[in-house]
Amino acid sequence: MALLQISEPGLSAAPHQRRLAAGIDLGTTNSLVATVRSGQAETLPDHEGRHLLPSVVHYQQQGHTVGYAARDNAAQDTTNTISSVKRMMGRSLADIQARYPHLPYRFKASVNGLPMIDTAAGLLNPVRVSADILKALAARASESLSGELDGVVITVPAYFDDAQRQGTKDAARLAGLHVLRLLNEPTAAAIAYGLDSGKEGVIAVYDLGGGTFDISILRLSRGVFEVLATGGDSALGGDDFDHLLADYIREQAGIADRSDNRVQRELLDAAIAAKIALSDADTVRVNVAGWQGEITREQFNDLISALVKRTLLACRRALKDAGVDPQDVLEVVMVGGSTRVPLVRERVGEFFGRTPLTAIDPDKVVAIGAAIQADILVGNKPDSEMLLLDVIPLSLGLETMGGLVEKVIPRNTTIPVARAQDFTTFKDGQTAMSIHVMQGERELVQDCRSLARFALRGIPPLPAGGAHIRVTFQVDADGLLSVTAMEKSTGVEASIQVKPSYGLTDGEIASMIKDSMSFAEQDVKARMLAEQKVEAARVLESLTGALTADAALLSAAERQCIDDAAAHLSAVAQGDDVDAIEQAIKNVDKQTQEFAARRMDQSVRRALKGHSVDEV
């Protein structure tokens, strides 16, 4: 019996008719395409039997090449040969230049600050470059399957934010592909291993690719895949190993000039070749730019040790989020070509206390999982009992009075998901409300990330708290967020789809979760203070309105007592003593109780005036 079966409109396969679907691993260094044939998932090779496609595009005035042919031109035509474009996806030009100062490309900024790469083929953005890689993969699949693809599942790092995910979908559309779903890379690996081995329990997926690192803690049970927690670093991968080794070789060779792009490429190529060789050998000879020398595995390990340690710190945070200890993990799945590095396997094994799984080629496992998922989503497996539950990496919420963040969807909530929460107006006669969408784990707006702002207008002018606005957050299966605000009595509404202009910085990604734990006690105190200050402001504003309307109900002595209490509250509300503010609010409440009762009596008498008892 199927646990969950959702068919895309128009994609229900007719009996005995298989639809053509593919899984695409759009990687930083290499990309792959896979499909399911005769019940088996397999990656598709090119004419020369090569399964990997280098994620490199070489642009010329009359066209472009993708893959190995493009990579071969890198040393001779560096500025027109674009590689590792995935690292630029969803980032601003300023962010890219600060993060990767040695990139050899000619950048120009568009109107909104996004990067444009000046090539022989004209100005191109990262979405266009990614689209050209996707086109090459789709063409390989169509030729191998003898038909056009009906749909694809494309994998992305678990830490990709809205802008990076949207950029990936835009690239697919530009390539003419129908995206069935974006799938987190570690989750795709879990699908591949979960179906093959049938393991049940907690599994860690350690994914170290060319440009990104992801760690996911999953629970597999009776065909249900649930992501308990995710973590990682969107700017850490095997490319960083390569650059560290290239810099070391440069120092050993005495090459001081960094402006020669051809030499830069030779150094990088030599570093990559040495890294690969050191996975099997203890020593490798290097010949570059007229220099010859030896690099040992021990030297390489010393260079990358700090980076490997960073990945293990992320593993520890993810385990804490999932509420499990390293010894609770049954299996550790290794994903990504960089997990072939012996030091990585050794340190990961020591951390989890078990030998990592490498049965499926770590370069291919993500594409294989994506192909299995695509085969299901396209309608070829209507009786599949696999249910996939992804999670959002950071909490989503709204700014409320006092600069506070009210979380609507907590982090690690499974997606797709929709959550609604009701809010009220703060002032009498308020006819509009500013909606400020936030992302993060801290209690104050200043410590979280702003995602979007929009306004709801047309709220009926009622007393403070009289209008009720329902705000709905909806996160789709690809992790993209839309927010809708609706005034319940009139039905007036406004909405926005959150598409940030560029992605989170490394500092934001790495520190937001860590800071939420480090500053937990401080944040709670700050929130309590802010809440009391907001309540004080509300009480004083309400009291001012009441006194303006009905001061005649008070004697001079009563009015003086209320004014004194209000003045004291106004004074202490400027300070940081939560208890003092709370006591001052209670004092105002005590001094105004009789006044409130008289106002209520007066309102009742006015309402009953001219009516008989029978009418009441």
Swiss-Prot record:
What Gene Ontology terms for biological process does this UniProt record contain? Answer: iron-sulfur cluster assembly
> Could you identify this protein by its name?
Chaperone protein HscA
HAMAP family listed in its UniProt record: HscA
What UniProt keywords apply to this chain's record, in alphabetical order? ATP-binding, Chaperone, Nucleotide-binding
**Similarity comment text for this entry:** Belongs to the heat shock protein 70 family.
Q: Which NCBIfam families match?
A: HscA, PRK05183.1
Name a GO molecular-function annotation: ATP-dependent protein folding chaperone
Query: Which Gene3D superfamilies does UniProt cross-reference here?
Result: 1.20.1270.10, 3.30.420.40, Actin, Chain A, domain 4, Substrate Binding Domain Of DNAk, Chain A, domain 1
The answer to whether keyword Manganese applies is no
Q: Which stretches are transmembrane?
A: none
Role this protein plays: Chaperone involved in the maturation of iron-sulfur cluster-containing proteins. Has a low intrinsic ATPase activity which is markedly stimulated by HscB. Involved in the maturation of IscU.
SUPFAM superfamilies (alphabetical): Actin-like ATPase domain, Heat shock protein 70kD (HSP70), C-terminal subdomain, Heat shock protein 70kD (HSP70), peptide-binding domain
**Keyword ATP-binding tagged:** yes
